[in-house]
Design a protein with these regions (language model features):
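Acidic helix N-cap motif at the loop->helix transition within catalytic regions
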Residues: 33-35, 61-70, 90
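Conserved donor NDP-sugar-binding/catalytic core segment of glycosyltransferases
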Residues: 120-153
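Conserved nucleotide-sugar donor-binding catalytic segment
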Residues: 100, 140, 156-238, 242-246
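Short aromatic/hydrophobic "clamp" motif used to bind/position activated sugar donors
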Residues: 107
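Cell-envelope/extracellular polymer assembly enzymes that use nucleotide-activated donors
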Residues: 19-22, 51, 201
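A conserved acidic beta->alpha catalytic loop
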Residues: 56-65, 85
Length: 309
């Protein structure tokens, strides 16, 4: 458990009626990791008030008890949400409730098995967003970590740069645990309720509000890979299916919004992923079927997508 007292954490905070930033942390059966995660939050050195919302989805391994212990020690910082029954198994999403509970102008997100390493991370991100209203989200690098240590950066190359609004609208890849963004997402469109990769949907919706800033000056966070990880340990076909379903949800959403370019973009992604696991003959038959039902321009884009798959 962190050596910092609540008084030490709050000593430089500007008096305020509400926290400027809310840290959102969903947790489930992460007893071995949750303490390190919470300690990395409590290590943050800021001039502003922040709160920590930890949502435990009825863990069975003692995770909830650890969260409750931390909340008792830091009652003015940690707000635990401890469910007696598993909400996920009932088809209920954590996102709407957790986001609506957040009091902050800004949100930072980190799962209960990941953690941060830079004690000035939040201060740097909030300072940037306060000074740059045309940006809606900030992010930085994360290292892939397991019991043997770190194994390189999670997202490299083309992802280590700023993102324009269109890239965000198109669900640009961002390391979720590194993000700090404006609290402008209050309702989840009905089409996105069944999307397995909710963070991709968040980035797309945030694109309607501004740009993304990559901040390499922030020390990398830790993206933990382990057998209990909800996404990191999924098989390739499972990840493909999750991406396909997410893009299909986004296509339906933008179709209802009347945004034809984004609807077609996500439709192309769905088509390409769908074709990636089938035979050449099946691809040809699918293309012939689609050719009879879409515009020439869209068919050309679908064909290019098929050739890449």
């Amino acid at each position: 458990m962190s050596n910092r007292t609540e008084q030490q954490i709050r000593q430089h905070w500007t008096p305020a009626h509400a926290p400027l930033l809310s840290i959102l942390c969903p947790a489930y059966n992460q007893k071995a990791y949750i303490a390190q995660t919470l300690d990395s939050f409590l290590a943050q050195q800021t001039s502003f008030a922040f709160e920590i919302l930890v949502n435990d989805d009825a863990s069975t391994d003692g995770t909830a008890a650890i969260i409750a212990d931390y909340a008792q020690r830091y009652p003015n910082i940690i707000r635990p949400i401890l469910h007696a029954e598993n909400q996920y198994q009932q088809g209920k999403l954590f996102f709407p409730d957790l986001f609506n509970r957040a009091q902050g102008k800004y949100l930072a997100y980190c799962d209960g098995d990941d953690y941060w390493t830079d004690p000035l991370k939040l201060q740097k991100q909030v300072d940037f967003l306060e000074a740059n209203p045309d940006y809606v989200i900030t992010y930085h690098d994360a290292l892939i970590t397991d019991e043997k240590g770190s194994h390189g950066v999670q997202l490299t190359g083309e992802w280590q740069r700023d993102a324009n609004r269109m890239e965000l609208l198109r669900g640009r890849r961002i390391s979720t645990l590194t993000t700090c963004f404006r609290n402008v997402l209050h309702e989840l469109p009905r089409e996105l309720e069944q999307a397995p990769l909710l963070d991709v949907c968040w980035w797309s919706m945030l694109g309607a509000h501004g740009k993304g800033k990559y901040m390499p000056e922030i020390a990398p966070g830790a993206y933990r890979v382990h057998n209990g990880g909800l996404f990191s340990m999924r098989a390739g076909k499972q990840k493909l299916h999750m991406s396909l379903q997410t893009y299909a949800c986004l296509a339906n959403y933008y179709q209802r919004q009347g945004d034809q370019p984004l609807y077609e973009y996500y439709l192309v992604q769905v088509f390409g992923l769908s074709l990636s696991a089938i035979s050449p003959l099946q691809k040809l038959n699918a293309l012939l079927l689609v050719a009879r039902n879409v515009s020439a321009n869209l068919f050309k884009r679908l064909t290019l997508s098929a050739s890449r798959g």
